[in-house]
């Protein structure tokens, strides 16, 4: 760089001030200054530095300052527990002289480990989601594979001895909105003796160098301590994409730790199932893909499953749809995902409300009282056309709150909502998913 940029100058000033505070023994102040300096240096590398030589020089300085910051962090942490001799700049802290025993016997007393495990406690699902297998329409193959991997080993452990072992890694992949996360909720409900960890990338990615892989390690450690356990990682592609030259060092280290922990070398991974979900399985790293022994394609629902979804989403709401209507809706929604059908039904449920809003006439009808549904009354008001016998000209603002009887959801409401809702899955993505299934997966 021909001239020093303001950000680079700021980084140099911060690093210089950090070194001064370090020498003066103000280690907490020095630690903060080192960390701020590194942030400025990294900004310069990413957005301002010209030429590989300049970048290499700045990266070397960053490594040096980060190493010193880690030592100060370790020293300050130990100082809280007991009085220690201050470290001189450039000298290893007492903790470093003992060597890195993070995998040793004393790890259980490590406050850093406890802090990381406390962070992960929020990922444990304490309250079971109330989703049963029967609430999941279709996907029989996926349900059977999950029962085989999760429910059977808990209920009949004697079946899985010797060479017959349950699956330890299952990948659910398919278009968005097909029920992958919903299936995981059903697993959490049905496997009521298991500890269920629901993880997203934000739970495992930290801004501090080296902390993300520690979080991954501690996640698996927690799972081993709470066996039988299920680790569900939604959108796993955001954590375990293919390795490339462009990815950051932090991402590479997280991936490596995942591979080590899923392989389970030197540790007992019995009783732990890793359940992953993704919409774009082709971006997964090949080594991660291999760790998932079962790779199950969750396709778009079949017509009978789509018909069942319309029923499930309508629930107990008053409607006039017949079995034939549900079958017709199932046929008309080819290419729609479960999430798309959910949106169609939600929109259809609003159609009676819109009729109330736009009505210019109401008529009196007989129906259940709002105060006591078992008691029928004759003075309820429902929207009607101006030509209906008994039509009264009024708007919804004139209707008393406890006297409105909204129209039931009808087939015409469903068809109107269907015409306004387009599928969210395109043909190109489906072809890629089918190709991946042919190469690596199995049908769900």
Swiss-Prot record:
Residue ranges with Basic and acidic residues bias: 77-88
Main localization, broad class: membrane
Tissues expressing the protein: Ubiquitously expressed.
Residues where ATP binds: 174-181
Record note on what altering residue 235 to Q does: Defective in vacuolar protein sorting
Keywords carried by this UniProt record: ATP-binding, Cell cycle, Cell division, Coiled coil, Endosome, Hydrolase, Membrane, Nucleotide-binding, Phosphoprotein, Protein transport, Transport
Chain segments carrying region Disordered: 77-117
Reaction equations catalysed: ATP + H2O = ADP + phosphate + H(+)
Regions annotated as coiled coil: 19-82
SMART domains in alphabetical order: AAA (SM00382), MIT (SM00745)
GO molecular function: ATP binding; ATP hydrolysis activity; identical protein binding; protein homodimerization activity; protein-containing complex binding
Consequence of changing residue 66 to D: Reduces HIV-1 release 3-fold
UniProt enzyme class: hydrolase
Stretches assigned to the MIT domain: 4-82
Effect of residue 15 to D: Reduces HIV-1 release 2-fold
Domain free text: The MIT domain serves as an adapter for ESCRT-III proteins. It forms an asymmetric three-helix bundle that binds amphipathic MIM (MIT interacting motif) helices along the groove between MIT helices 2 and 3 present in a subset of ESCRT-III proteins thus establishing the canonical MIM-MIT interaction. In an extended conformation along the groove between helices 1 and 3, also binds to a type-2 MIT interacting motif (MIM2).
Listed PANTHER family: AAA DOMAIN-CONTAINING, VACUOLAR PROTEIN SORTING-ASSOCIATED PROTEIN 4B
Record text on subunit structure and interactions: Proposed to be monomeric or homodimeric in nucleotide-free form and to oligomerize upon binding to ATP to form two stacked hexameric or heptameric rings with a central pore through which ESCRT-III substrates are translocated in an ATP-dependent manner. In vitro, associates on the inside of a helical tubular structure formed by a CHMP2A-CHMP3 polymer. Interacts with CHMP1A, CHMP1B, CHMP2A, CHMP4B and CHMP6. Interacts with VPS4A; the interaction suggests a heteromeric assembly with VPS4A. Interacts with VTA1.
Entry similarity comment: Belongs to the AAA ATPase family.
Protein's name in the database: Vacuolar protein sorting-associated protein 4B
Source organism of this protein record: Homo sapiens
């Amino acid at each position: 760089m021909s001239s020093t940029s303001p950000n680079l100058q700021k980084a140099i000033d911060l690093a210089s001030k950090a070194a001064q505070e370090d020498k003066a023994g103000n280690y907490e102040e020095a630690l903060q200054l080192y960390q701020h300096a590194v942030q400025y240096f990294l900004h310069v590398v990413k957005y301002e530095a010209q030429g590989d030589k300049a970048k290499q020089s700045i990266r070397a300085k960053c490594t040096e300052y980060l190493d010193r910051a880690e030592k100060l962090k370790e020293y300050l942490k130990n100082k809280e527990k007991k009085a220690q001799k201050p470290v001189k700049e450039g000298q290893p802290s007492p903790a470093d002289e003992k060597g890195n025993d993070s995998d040793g016997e004393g790890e259980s007393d490590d406050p850093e480990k406890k802090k990381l495990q406390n962070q992960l406690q929020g990922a444990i699902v304490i309250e079971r989601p109330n989703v049963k297998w029967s609430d999941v329409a279709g996907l029989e193959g996926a349900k059977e594979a999950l029962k085989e991997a999760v429910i059977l080993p808990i209920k009949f452990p004697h079946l899985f001895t010797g060479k017959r072992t349950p699956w330890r890694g299952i990948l659910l992949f398919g278009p968005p909105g097909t029920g992958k996360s919903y299936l995981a909720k059903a697993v959490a409900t049905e496997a009521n003796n298991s500890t269920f960890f629901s993880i997203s990338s934000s739970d495992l990615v930290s801004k501090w160098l080296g902390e993300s892989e520690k979080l991954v390690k501690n996640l698996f450690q927690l799972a081993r301590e709470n066996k039988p356990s299920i680790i569900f990682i939604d959108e796993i592609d955001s954590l375990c994409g293919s390795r490339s030259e462009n990815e950051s060092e932090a991402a590479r280290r997280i991936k490596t730790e995942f591979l080590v922990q899923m392989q389970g070398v030197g540790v007992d991974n019995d009783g732990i199932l890793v359940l992953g979900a993704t919409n774009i399985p082709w971006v997964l790293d090949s080594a991660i893909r291999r760790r998932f022994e079962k790779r199950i394609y969750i396709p778009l629902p079949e017509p009978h499953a789509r018909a069942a979804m319309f029923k499930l989403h309508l629930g107990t709401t008053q409607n006039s749809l017949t079995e034939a209507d549900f079958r017709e809706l199932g046929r008309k929604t080819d290419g729609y995902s479960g999430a798309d059908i959910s949106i169609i039904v939600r929109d259809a449920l609003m159609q009676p409300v819109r009729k109330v809003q736009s009505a210019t006439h109401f008529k009196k009808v007989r129906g259940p009282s709002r105060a006591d549904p078992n008691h029928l009354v004759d003075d309820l008001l429902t929207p009607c056309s101006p030509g209906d016998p008994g039509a009264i000209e009024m708007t919804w603002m004139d209707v008393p709150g406890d006297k409105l009887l909204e129209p039931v959801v009808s087939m015409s409401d469903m068809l109107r909502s269907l015409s306004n809702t387009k599928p969210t899955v395109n043909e190109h993505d489906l072809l890629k998913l089918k190709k991946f299934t042919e190469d690596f997966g199995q049908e769900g």
